[in-house]
Amino acid sequence: MTIFRPHLRFLFKPHFLYFQSPIGKSSRPFSTSQILRTALDMPPPPVDTTQRLAKLRELMAQNKVDVYSMQFRYTIKAPLIITVVYSFFFFLLLALKLCLRKTAISQSTLLHVTGVETLIRITAAFISSFTGSAGCAIVSMSKAALSTDGRYFSQAAKQLDANWTLLKRGVEGVPTWEEWTAEQAENGKVVGVDPSLITAGENLQYSPLTSVIVVNCSYVIADARKLSQTLKTTGGSLIGIDQNLIDAVWGDERPARPANQITVQPVERAGKSFEEKVEDLRKELAAKKRSAMVISTLDEIAWLFNLRGSDIPYNPVFFSYAIVTPSVAELYVDESKLSPEARKHLEGKVILKPYDSIFQASKVLAESKASASSGSSGKFLLSNKASWSLSLALGGEQNVVEVRSPITDAKAIKNEVELEGFRKCHIRDGAALIEYFAWLENALIKEGAQLDEVDGADKLFEIRKKYDLFVGNSFDTISSTGANGATIHYKPEKSTCAVIDPEAMYLCDSGGQYLDGTTDTTRTLHFGEPTEFQKKAYALVLKGHISIDNAIFPKGTTGYAIDSFARQHLWKEGLDYLHGTGHGVGSFLYAEVPLSANNVLSNEPGYYEDGNFGIRLENLVICKEVQTAHKFGDKPFLGFESITLVPFCQKLLDASLLTEAERKWVNDYHARVWEKTSPFFEKDELTTAWLKRETQPI
């Protein structure tokens, strides 16, 4: 899966999670199954949004709002791999209301950081008809604009109707969504935001019109400060309001909160007991002299307590909050969702509290502050991704220290049990993909079958289900033929998808959730005769992939230093791609956090020709310490171990375009693919023949 992150991103198939077992989350009552059905029932894009915008503008007028903005950043394609987590789902649902002054915007991100991507997609699609995973929709009384990044330029152009202006993020001369919003809010207009959907920042006031913060949210945008500063340049200002206009639009039709069962991730797969993890967190609190940590990020809670849920499609998390002090651990969750095993798992070690009581509990915590015997400063630790409303409940900045969550860093470093689980599940998943590609080629070429993109995705799911420890997909399968492959986060729908063309490129980006790990693999194939340019583009992408796989770098290196390894060959030809080269914990390319041994990341360069084809080649890799002849500065050096086991397409491989070293890399890789996966097909002649052909030396 790919992700665009101009300032933070290699992982972000969100702060991205690499959960080791699958299963989800939210604060307001939303049923993911209902949301998913709604998404599937939506009419094919583009949708005429005239009436929807008119209704929204009526509500804006009633609430004395001139501008309404919704920011959403989540990754449709992001498998939650708690094991490598860095969950960066900005979910949308936002809201606002202002009064006394005319004004503006509701910026939204997500509740609980991890996982309401379906909800966001529905909300964003409802208003704009755009179904991409990242962007910002802004509506004034006379204009509507949608800002998104390069992954979605093509998709947005197709899905937005005439009511909307597309703001291409990162393109010279095009305003950012903050700048565009500031233009709409000039001359003293006030921009309102839901405090549960933004992080606390400077220059923000809380509206005295409401005294109770009702909405719960844990992963919020960190742009409140930036937005406030931008608004000041045009005379606008930013305040927090408690009302959510989207809730008002939904009314009684708002889906109920998920009530899916919560299960235990056994220590045999987690590699570490939750008691040890909680104790490690307490040591961190003691080192920082803090009284407690309030946790709202769903993947962090699931990882910390070795629990898994299924409240969010493809993501093993559940709606919850947690508070950890030097002596007590509290989990705020709907107790009816806990399996008997989960209850026993927590019994006597974790105090269970009602999910909806977190804000009151935070206020009580703030009032009591820290006990004198704790030796702490009395301040509470809060993730810098937590909501402004949660910070306020804890007493604001005088009681709260907002930092990068220590749990995020702990999750990013996999233990040996987790790493071995990743390796094993990739062997099985590689076999499933090999079986699928062999079946697909045979069906298209030998049998002349008419198969569409959804047929392909469904067949892959059927095949994966046969393999041990499979739980479900880790994200929506991107099964795309021809021009659809150029839409980076393409999602085929039965009513609008294309028939797979054997004479066109076929891009398949998919992943599975297994009890012992999560997979994410992309391969691009051709079942006919590719053009010379297609083979050259494929070679350039493969060269970049190999360059990353072979990279050796000193500990402390960030993704910025490595990104050019993947792009250098494309750059020499004047080509590039508009997404991050990878994702994983701690992030990789486009990440500010240095890479560390035992991070799990993706390596996925690509190339996309709009209206024609797309190429992406993705393996997951483990960052590990490597032996070098010297150690400059007595610093260890790191490299990568590729764990994905699926061959590259022989029809697209032109050996003459690769160096001798690159050809050796391909041959060695294919030999390993054959060794690890061929035993699965001893009684499957068709797949064995396909695999033997695709792994032959070049």
UniProtKB/Swiss-Prot annotation:
GO cellular component terms listed in the entry, alphabetical order: cytoplasm
A Pfam family assignment: Creatinase_N
Binding positions for Mn(2+) 1 per the UniProt entry: D520, E604, E618
Cofactor binding note from Swiss-Prot or TrEMBL: Binds 2 manganese ions per subunit.
Binding positions (Mn(2+) 2): D509, D520, E618
GO MF annotations, alphabetized: metal ion binding; metalloaminopeptidase activity
Catalytic activity: Release of any N-terminal amino acid, including proline, that is linked to proline, even from a dipeptide or tripeptide
Domain of life: Eukaryota
Name by which UniProt lists this protein: Probable Xaa-Pro aminopeptidase P
Native organism: Arthroderma benhamiae (strain ATCC MYA-4681 / CBS 112371) (Trichophyton mentagrophytes)
